[in-house]
Amino acid sequence: MIYIKNPNEIQKIKNAAQIYKKIVKQFNFDYIKNKSLKEIDQMLRDFVSQHHANSCYHGYLGFKGYHCLSLNQTIIHGLANDEIFTSKDKLTIDIGIELDNYYCDSAFTILGPDVNPRQKLLSEVTHNCIFELVKKIVPNQTTTNDLGIWTEEYAKKYGYSVIKDFGGHGCGIKIHEDPIILNYGTKKSSELLTPNMVICIEPMFFEKDNRYYIDPDDSWSVKPVNKNQYVCHWEHMVLIKEDQAEILTL
């Protein structure tokens, strides 16, 4: 079901997004360097709790962590473990926040200062893809299929590929709502983007080919079959307005 939000609901969603923006500011490399993913997960949980909100991924479909922490070869859905985040690493932090029964869902990638330049470029391109899509959105004209086509075209400009079975979605009243927003075009389903929809746009890029598997050790972490490459994921919540789109998590 697609939820068209009213002004009060939009404000509640923005309130949740404010907590996310504070996390992005606080959780930089220097703040979490040389800590384990489990420690970072707990730090995030504490931060969210201090703002009278909940980390809503915990228990969702059986997820045992509180946030998705995707280190290096994990592109999405990383489950916190004892691995240490160092200066040579990429870490994507995907956060679901519930505040007063409204939700924010967004993800950002932190790069250590000694990360490979290829990983740095991939992260920049993945993040910039969202900005390019948001600029192109025309309410009551653009569709979710357009977003998928534009995402894959943008990735291919740099020789990258997109994940095929995961993507963005509606959000706000529930953590995951319709419509599904794939990272590629499909004729199977396409929804018009209309005012007062809130969606999550989340490009997930592979540096090379997009074959993947789910790590059997934790049954969550999505990783590339081809290990000789880098991967990256970014996500922003976007409000569709009357004449344009607005990023709520920036």
From Swiss-Prot:
Sequence positions that bind a divalent metal cation 1: 94, 105, 235
Cofactor binding note of this UniProt entry: Binds 2 divalent metal cations per subunit. Has a high-affinity and a low affinity metal-binding site. The true nature of the physiological cofactor is under debate. The enzyme is active with cobalt, zinc, manganese or divalent iron ions. Most likely, methionine aminopeptidases function as mononuclear Fe(2+)-metalloproteases under physiological conditions, and the catalytically relevant metal-binding site has been assigned to the histidine-containing high-affinity site.
Cofactor entry: Co(2+); Zn(2+); Mn(2+); Fe(2+)
Gene3D superfamilies reported for this sequence: Creatinase/methionine aminopeptidase superfamily (3.90.230.10)
Keyword Metal-binding: yes
Keywords associated with the record: Aminopeptidase, Hydrolase, Metal-binding, Protease
Positions annotated to bind substrate: 77, 176
Cysteine-cysteine disulfides: none
InterPro entries assigned: Creatinase/aminopeptidase-like, Pept_M24, Pept_M24_MAP, Pept_M24A_MAP1
Key word Coiled coil present: no
Documented EC number(s): 3.4.11.18
CDD domains: MetAP1
Catalytic activity: Release of N-terminal amino acids, preferentially methionine, from peptides and arylamides
GO terms, biological process: proteolysis
One example GO MF annotation: metalloaminopeptidase activity
GO annotation, cellular component aspect: cytosol
Functional summary from the UniProt entry: Removes the N-terminal methionine from nascent proteins. The N-terminal methionine is often cleaved when the second residue in the primary sequence is small and uncharged (Met-Ala-, Cys, Gly, Pro, Ser, Thr, or Val). Requires deformylation of the N(alpha)-formylated initiator methionine before it can be hydrolyzed.
Recorded family membership: Belongs to the peptidase M24A family. Methionine aminopeptidase type 1 subfamily.
The name this protein goes by in its record: Methionine aminopeptidase
Gene designation: map
